[in-house]
Design a protein with these regions (language model features):
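N-terminal auxiliary segments of SAM/dcSAM-dependent transferases
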Residues: 2-67
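Conserved class I S-adenosyl-L-methionine
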Residues: 53-113, 128-132, 136, 154-157, ...
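Class I SAM-dependent methyltransferase SAM/SAH-binding core
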Residues: 118-179
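Short beta->alpha hinge that forms the Motif I/post-I loop of the SAM-binding pocket
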Residues: 150, 201, 224
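A short SAM/SAH-binding and catalytic strip from SAM-dependent methyltransferases
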Residues: 189-201
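A short glycine-rich, Lys/Arg-flanked "PGG" loop and its adjoining helix->strand segment in the class I
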Residues: 203-215
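C-terminal alpha-helical "lid/dimerization" subdomain adjacent to the S-adenosyl-L-methionine
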Residues: 220-277
């Protein structure tokens, strides 16, 4: 992450602008802190990774999920590859291809002026979607990719994956989905895969995604929901419950969408996963 990238961030406590205080490594952030110009709070940066999390405000459920994902991080990719086909009835790639078109990346067009387009993945995890973004984006388009996660373990796996990535760089940071460290309306696409069912406050998480998305842009959320066609199957009920042990009811959070959400589509993309797409219209619409 460069100094210019850091200028696109905002204080997660007050949303004020941040200034970097510390050392640089080949023009990228090294170690130091991002200090808020408004509230003067300092947010640490270690080895180029900003940590923009107010730990006192992280919900208990999210703390638990962070510990779980930190522990599972080294096993996440191989276990997913092995178990996804027999449980989901399709390959991992086919399931991801079920929601990627909802981002409508091919319809992106350059902004007026020199500002690049920006795409945010909330809960980037081990970075499995990064190559799919690169695949679906127009090649000559100036696009910044941003990814955040609460789990240091998953971000470490993501950074390892990106060492071999030959496309656009992914700007990574540690952050809480309930308090995204960005100004309002600064992303041209926002999406999240596989975590909102474990959020302490899903309504707040959806509101934050909507806040940082530009008006009328697709916001795509994917997580666990048992396909109605398999709800009478004891096997699938047991397996789904094991997969979602942390949540009393894992369903598409349509009821938690921000007021005024339009273009709402909730669909099943595999046996155990839904895809929810919505937009927030312009205020003058």
């Amino acid at each position: 992450m460069t100094l210019a990238d850091a200028g696109a961030l905002a204080c997660p406590a007050c949303r004020g602008p941040l200034e970097f205080e510390g050392t640089l490594a080949d023009g990228d952030l090294g170690s130091g802190a991002l200090r808020c110009v408004r509230c003067v709070r300092a947010w640490p940066v270690h080895d180029g990774l900003p940590r923009l999390v107010d730990e006192a405000r992280v919900p208990r459920a999210d703390r638990f999920m962070r510990v779980l994902y930190d522990w599972l991080a080294p096993l996440h990719d191989p276990v997913t590859r092995a178990l996804f086909p027999p449980l989901q009835g399709t390959s991992e790639r086919a399931a991801r291809d079920g929601y990627m078109p909802r981002l409508a990346l091919g319809s992106l067009r350059p902004l007026d002026g020199a500002e690049p387009l920006r795409i945010l993945e909330v809960g980037v995890g081990a970075g499995a979607n990064v190559p799919l973004l690169e695949r679906d984006l127009p090649r000559d388009l100036d696009v910044e990719l941003w990814g955040l996660d609460l789990s240091d373990g998953m971000l470490d796996r993501c950074r390892r994956r990106l060492v071999h990535h030959r496309g656009r760089p992914m700007r990574l940071l540690v952050a809480d989905a309930h308090a995204l460290p960005f100004p309002d309306a600064c992303f041209d696409r926002v999406f999240h895969v596989g975590g909102i069912g474990g959020y302490g406050n899903p309504r707040r998480g959806l509101a934050e995604m909507a806040r940082v998305a530009r008006p009328d842009t697709p916001i795509v959320v994917v997580d666990e929901q048992l396909d109605p066609e398999h709800r009478d199957s004891p096997f699938h009920r047991v397996m789904f419950r094991a997969l979602t042990f942390y949540s009393a009811a894992s369903t598409s959070p349509v009821a938690h969408l921000p007021p005024g959400a339009t273009g709402v589509v909730s669909e099943q993309v595999s046996r155990y996963y839904y895809c929810l797409t919505f937009r927030i219209p312009r205020h003058d619409a």
